[in-house]
């Protein structure tokens, strides 16, 4: 995908599918942008390969996206992207991943992950950082780091974005239009 997919704060709820490898987008090209999108209560299964919530390979930008639910696979799992050669900014994951070698945000990072947070069973946001940069972000454990901490950290990284995170009534971040933007 090489266009701009602006979810405009919308939610896709109950996405449930199984394929050899499973993700919403296969490849996000260097010119591609996916932003302001929430996937809620997904159930994804990669029957012979890997599974990721948003994209298999990111070469573009993923901004202000989130995934909740269960992601499992014959191979490895990730909440947002399997491999990152671009930018992932102010995203979060909360759910269940296959425990073996999983990254809540990304499995292999070769570029930039900024202010991304996660909850659920994953211990690491980035499973393997291969020359990339990880700036900010943490596991939300409810004691040291709470979801409000995540909201504040993500919004700091979203300067100029048309949506910001706010703490929803269910205790998890939700997207809200930034009234300061046109």
Question: What name fits each language-model region?
Answer:
Residues 1-182:
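Predominantly extracellular beta-rich ligand-binding scaffolds that present long acidic/polar faces
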